[in-house]
Amino acid sequence: TPDGEAPFAAQAAILHRHEYESTDDAPVVRHDLELRVMITTGTAIAVGAAALIMIVLGTMAATGANLGPLDTTASTKPLLVTMLILLAASAALCWQTMLGGLAGLINMRRGNTADTMPAMAAVASILQCIMFLAKPEWYNPATLCLMTGPAALLLCGNAAGKAIDAHTIRDNFTLVSAGMDHAVAYRLKDAGVLRTVTAGLAEPRPNVLVSRPTRLMKGFLAGSESRRTSDKNQQQFARILLGCGVAAFLFTLLYRKDAGTAFTALAGVLCLGAPLAGTLISAMPMRLMQRSAAQIGAVIPGWKDIRLLGRVNVLQVTAQDLFPKGCITLRGIKPVRKEDIELAIIYSASMLADVNTPLKDIFLGMTGDNRKLLCKVENLETLDGLGYVGWINGERVMIGSRRLMDTYDIQLPSMEYERRHTVNQRRVIYLAVSGKLFSMFQVAYQSDPDTAAVLDSLRRAGLSLIVDCDDFNCDEALLQTAYNLPVGTVKVLSGKEHKALEPAVAWLPESEGSMLHLGSFASFVGGLEAA
């Protein structure tokens, strides 16, 4: 099946009568998930108890121990009937496993499933009991072993894996339906935008993971039921195992001329050849991974999303992600006139107070975070990669880079003068009022130790970065120097490239995606690393 489809759509519909399509669906979906947890957990416990009873009875019968009413000395029928009833009841409790497993074996187009091997083992063991009941002389407890116990144990392992999956989905849904804005990470699919934003990176086949704020993650339950990575191999092995079982049956029947031994060989191959942890082999790692992701507020719904995240080689981040609060510091103020220094601070803080840039903390900090001191800014305009233009008290105010000032023909100090003030990861911010330079601010960029460790881990994993920049001072040279990033592994988007990417990262009330996170760099990257 395609990655986006569950292996059995009908089963998914039974397990989840409602998809999470709006916040109003949360109570109903939560009830369905709680019910599923209760049913799968109860099934695993009941089938496990039945398996234990059958294994004990079978062992006692083989050793000649006194079984009381089930003693095989006089007749084997009471024991066989008891075993048959217990196994049939276990199979009935696991009816979805039986139905899905046998359907997957017969109809290859139905998709891959880990249910086939336990279903085959149960059918073969039931057949063994029925044949021994029909021909009691075929069954000798001292020489032949009933496979009902191992078959039920396989059903128990399968049910336990599904119970763990149910607990994982329920816990994930608690985070997904928390009623707060999150962010959804998804693979950028627009080929034109993809080429635009990755031009210049050394990655020949970029798979870009972008993130957008949202309130609801679409298709969460369907994603949670997606095909496991191991299902295809288990389905193929099930067909091979069935072939071996049939071969063992025919060989024993023809060579030993003993039908009882032949049916025991068939059941034995199917029971002992199947992995006990068929679903646990995927359920346990998924559970542990989700617990790790949940600690930093991330949710990866299912195996389809894990596979997709594993193919990602480019991440979209922002300057605020790379230079969190405290990493950018003010190193100097050079007003044109010394008496204008306070006004320069107020104008700069006013221009940056309501824009999404890491620089605003510096200027607001100089005012003591007292917004009452700020001036009203009208017609504020963001010029990507250049700076900001607005009007204060009827005067046009600009704050930004040298390129912004050159665009508006503002006279500036020489480039040689600027170079002397931009060494060691330092940059100059210009403030102009009414067409004239008003002040210069010197800021320094320092790497964040935690961010540096994360970026080093991403670099070693072969991931590159595109920086959707909200800081006009930020460029590739600064990032390569601050975080020791190789050339070709980081790209700062230009204004045109930012516009091309903007629709892909804009807020939507609901969005499809492969991972839900808190919107922070730690949650975004932490969830990706957990996957």
Which functions belong to the PLM regions below?
Residues 3-121, 128-237:
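Structural motif at membrane-water interfaces of alpha-helical integral membrane proteins
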